[in-house]
Amino acid sequence: MLYPSIDNLLLKIDSKYSLVTVAAKRARYMQLENDKGVLPSYQSDKFVGKALEEIHAGKLVLQNDEK
């Protein structure tokens, strides 16, 4: 079973499209900037997995810029 589960992640960000977009952007940033991340430890070795763990932990959120 994958950690974190899609059901738990959708409690943090309400749409699958937004979830994938946020995770992909964070993963790309971590890869390009050699960012070690904001959590003390990660279960995943891959950038996308680390981004999803950050979303699950509440350290990475979606900002809605609509006015």
From Swiss-Prot:
SUPFAM superfamilies per UniProt: RPB6/omega subunit-like (SSF63562)
Record keyword Hydrolase present: no
Catalysis performed (reactions): RNA(n) + a ribonucleoside 5'-triphosphate = RNA(n+1) + diphosphate
GO process terms (BP): DNA-templated transcription
Keywords of this entry: DNA-directed RNA polymerase, Nucleotidyltransferase, Transcription, Transferase
Keyword Transferase (UniProt): yes
Enzyme Commission no: 2.7.7.6
Molecular function GO labels: DNA binding; DNA-directed RNA polymerase activity
One GO cellular component, as annotated: DNA-directed RNA polymerase complex
Record's function text: Promotes RNA polymerase assembly. Latches the N- and C-terminal regions of the beta' subunit thereby facilitating its interaction with the beta and alpha subunits.
Subunit record text: The RNAP catalytic core consists of 2 alpha, 1 beta, 1 beta' and 1 omega subunit. When a sigma factor is associated with the core the holoenzyme is formed, which can initiate transcription.
Family in the record: Belongs to the RNA polymerase subunit omega family.
Protein name in UniProt: DNA-directed RNA polymerase subunit omega
Source species: Listeria innocua serovar 6a (strain ATCC BAA-680 / CLIP 11262)
Taxonomic classification: Bacteria, Bacillati, Bacillota, Bacilli, Bacillales
